[in-house]
C-alpha cells in the first residue's frame, strides 16, 4: 500500500487537487476572529460569515467566495507561514506544524460524517454576523479547536 500524499509530500509539493482535498469542510475558518492589537492573540467567535450555510458547513456561493465582497481569505501554499490563526484541527495548520491529520479527517475516514460526529464542525453551532451587535460577547472560551 502506498503512503498517503499528505504523509509523503510537503504542502508546497502538493497538486492543486491534493491541496484542496486537505480541507475537511468543518467551516471553522469561516467564523470571525478577533485579534488583540497589543498581543496579536487570536480569539475565536461563534459568529459566522453571512455566506456560510450552518447545516452543510459550506459557502453558499463557493465559486464566487473571493469576489463576493466578503473577507474570505484564500489559503495558498505561499501563505503557509501565516497559518497560525487557523484552528488547531485544520489540516493545513497541522501539516505545516508537522502534525498528523486528526483521526476523524475525511481523507482518513472517507466521509465528513466522522468529523460531524466528533463535534469538529460548526454545524448548527453558530450565529450570523447580521444578528450580532457586539462580537466580543461571542468569543468562544477555550474552543475545542
Curated annotation (Swiss-Prot):
Stated name of the protein: UPF0260 protein VV2402
TM segment ranges: none
Species in which this protein is naturally found: Vibrio vulnificus (strain YJ016)
PANTHER family attached to this UniProt entry: UPF0260 PROTEIN YCGN (PTHR37421:SF1)
HAMAP family named among the record's database cross-references: UPF0260 (MF_00676)
InterPro entries: Puta_zinc/iron-chelating_dom, UCP006173
Homology family: Belongs to the UPF0260 family.
A Pfam entry, by short name: CxxCxxCC
Amino acid at each position: 500500500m502506498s503512503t498517503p500524499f499528505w504523509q509523503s509530500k510537503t504542502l508546497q509539493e502538493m497538486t492543486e487537487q491534493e491541496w484542496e482535498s486537505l480541507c475537511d469542510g468543518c467551516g471553522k475558518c469561516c467564523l470571525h476572529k478577533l485579534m488583540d492589537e497589543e498581543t496579536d492573540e487570536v480569539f475565536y467567535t461563534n459568529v459566522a460569515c453571512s455566506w456560510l450555510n450552518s447545516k452543510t458547513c459550506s459557502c453558499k456561493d463557493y465559486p464566487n467566495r473571493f469576489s463576493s465582497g466578503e473577507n474570505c481569505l484564500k489559503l495558498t501554499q505561499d501563505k503557509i507561514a501565516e497559518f497560525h490563526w487557523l484552528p488547531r484541527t485544520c489540516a493545513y495548520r497541522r501539516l505545516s506544524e508537522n502534525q498528523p491529520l486528526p483521526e476523524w479527517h475525511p481523507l482518513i475516514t472517507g466521509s465528513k460524517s466522522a468529523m460531524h460526529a466528533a463535534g469538529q464542525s460548526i454545524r448548527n453551532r453558530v450565529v450570523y454576523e447580521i444578528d450580532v451587535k457586539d462580537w466580543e460577547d461571542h468569543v468562544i472560551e477555550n474552543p475545542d479547536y
